[in-house]
């Protein structure tokens, strides 16, 4: 049967229904704030007789069944109900609708009041109490305090009985200083109090740490967490300045704090209020907390119980994640720890409820206080006194890959940082001449690859290490010793001490981050997704913390491994490895601006202050070498059309022979049966597409902005895509040029379909058929730019791009009457270009500001070329998204469009509807896009999100009827990343609930989801599983890494050659990813079910949301996309189709096969001299990039077979045979050159590549020895 009406569900449902068990009463008071409930209960307890009262937390009434039960047993018997929903109606709509309906039916009164001190018109429809009465009731809460709690009860009773109404609310200070035992006091009283509690030291004024918390805690007397923080700070010799506010958006509160801070300026602020003053994506509103330049630490008074926190790998519930983590990041706060938890202290029989209070946890309080004190100490110290450690990542763990940092010339950036520090007065010593000199110096000492026969500059003795190790929690010690044995067994333990990869430059030390441990035993990748780090890793950070005495640590560039160590996702405990190893140290982390997810991981698990930096410069691929020759031949062929047929045949044969010779036929999609004309048409379109691809042109150097052509090309890349509403100066520059040049028709946009009215179509250079013959106008301003033929729409696009670059650089003047283009150029000159040019200085300013213990301004994150110029200038402490708003309506539109194109492509390729896809969802990508991946998954199964249109938050889902869908539903298995699991628990629940709801009574052919769930449930029941559990397990469609672990397992196996066959790679992927997630499921081991899902998938789907990188830039793509393919092939007996989709332009998603995408990237970027020349500007790190690219090619070949012989051949010719490039690598990074040759040799030995030259293997085998000899000679 078909579902004719849309069905709906919510994601706000509680995990389970709760029966509060309350008997009826005259008055019910429901609130989301436990402090209010406590205050009202206390006021009621002071009374004898009178009306009966029941109180309840709204958080206990999130599940619809809980609401129904409460209304039936308790609420419908009341005479008055007062509700205070925090956050508006959207979170509690089901409850409010049910209560209002009951009030109308049973004729009692209901007053729904705002949960804070801001009016909320959206609540008015749920009330029956008159507006003036609601205002009076609300005032008792906005003023607060025990007296007003009593007056509220009096007023509520008056509404029920008709008695005289009491006096209005008594005013209570909105903000002020509060002190234990003294109450609300002034600045002078505070100064006297703290002076008497501090041990006097001549000439020393102790630091001041502000503690900002909600006024509601003073009102209710729930101040124990504040008192605990005061005690912990004082124990460290620091003055605590506890200040309360009604809200950081309240003008009176802000003014009061400004006055207090003007007399008693804090060095650091610890903030316990939730939410943010600014809104994500809006202009920043500075807060009073950082007005003195103080860094602001976010401490959390959690809404969860201590038991929930201790047992949860997530650490915090979704509501805490949004209110106390994600939104405070928008204001630039540094996440410290959850320092208190909710505890039911007593059961109050009069109100039939547990009175819940805040219970501080000593260890968490102490850690947060230590972090605050350490920030204060950094701020108080003079630059010359500060001891700073700078750590560079190193993976793979080889000498050719030191200083890993995505998109970053990490060594050169580190030298820039050292130089800037020296100018600021830091005791830096002699700064290396450049990045290559720094690397040579570090490589003379121990590295992850080798320690023997190296200069050991820094070491930590066994006794000193044992002192550190013994101070760790027992669980940590047991796990490390259990896995790695005694410290002396560590491979970096030499002659009684650990040899450390560190080098001092005055009071600054630069080091190479140790390996996680997989390099010691690569096969451990199979079995240990949560592998604990070895002794050598702990020894490195022990030395920095204790022997060196680092006051702050810098991790240079995306990304290291510290933030990915085992432990909770949020609100870490002492047994979480990032905390145990790193401790409460100030942490500065330069990080690429377009990767909010992985940077956010560092913010949330290591309290990092991000200093975001630019992407690498971007440019057009253009044509080169054999591709340019082909292009000229194709132009010659079409110019000769209509002439001598024999010459045409000769030209076509010459062209197609060359195409086949270099393997371009398969990349261009030329089939064996294609006619010459069809083959040439495909080739022409392909060459045009390659030319216009966006590629990287070198790397970014931290603190240095691009100049000259690099600045021009990056500016053009940012201006290519419309920004904002795409109007005026925010239009696409290329579209503006096309419009002003009068280019119309002659190339139908691919998204428009076959519209014959060509002349009526405005020409769109971003969406056209490149190989279409151009018969339109050829204005001289475009024609004069190039002597190349102007034959196709692609030639038109090329000229538009050339003109755009000339206009942006100022080499050509824009015609006065080109209004559209002039508007865009005005925006470029006033905003876009300056934001790029200012980024270098802003990055260094942000870095030095953070290093001086001062507040670093926050800013948004994302891909600048995806219409996000607001992320520039860089140099800010970026934030991500409000996870409650994911997926956004715009993301759903893109996801839906991409889903339909994907299904259409599969139908075209295979001749039948798809039934099952496997899709990867990454936290970073979904932060950048607002949820494209999860939106696409929902669209594929035939569901869509529902939103509260006021707050724009996702409230639930709606099942799309088959009649509307117009196709069968596609069963989707999600393999989520560890960070997606941590950051998007609500989205996991959304998809989980939606796919279960989709299991409708529809025909199997139309709904394989339902068919498979029914069949699997029956199978599980036959095996003895209870029906409910069988149904639940059969519904699992979201899988990820083990709780507390991250990744997909393949990197270490590939890097360390720890595999024999593809089955080994499949096994690792399955072992690491076989944990089921969903509503109420936090990672249940379900290997058999994960295998069953992958066995039946027909296609692997991977989306790429920007072109600032490609799939051969990172190990993530091959690990997830390739890993899923390898596992599915191993289980199902054949390799599924693999689609790698381009979402870089949201209005025009493009579906490509993995083979197509790899071919494009190899041709346009990997072997393109323009890219090679760009990385060669960066010496050692440039050679690193070349070797890394070949690694990723190899890994895709190993996992998917999608890399062809001619791709390897092209790389071999470009990097080995080309003497210019080979000499560069031998000179700048001989280790990387040897690693590259070794990887190509491995490709031959594993039958992944058959070279054309018989001598290739011999040549490659000799390079490693020669490179080693050369390096030894240089040393």
UniProtKB/Swiss-Prot annotation:
It comes from the Bacteria. This is Aerobic cobaltochelatase subunit CobN. GO terms for cellular component: cytoplasm. Keywords: ATP-binding, Cobalamin biosynthesis, Cytoplasm, Ligase, Nucleotide-binding, Porphyrin biosynthesis. Pathway: Cofactor biosynthesis; adenosylcobalamin biosynthesis; cob(II)yrinate a,c-diamide from precorrin-2 (aerobic route): step 10/10. GO terms for molecular function: ATP binding; cobaltochelatase activity. It is an enzyme of class 6 (ligase). Its EC number is 6.6.1.2. InterPro entries: Cobalto_CobN (IPR011953), CobN/Mg_chltase (IPR003672). Heterotrimer of CobN, CobS and CobT. Catalyzes cobalt insertion in the corrin ring. It holds the Pfam family CobN-Mg_chel. It is found in: Cytoplasm. The keyword Ligase applies. GO terms for biological process: cobalamin biosynthetic process; porphyrin-containing compound biosynthetic process. It catalyses: hydrogenobyrinate a,c-diamide + Co(2+) + ATP + H2O = cob(II)yrinate a,c diamide + ADP + phosphate + 5 H(+). The keyword Nucleotide-binding applies.
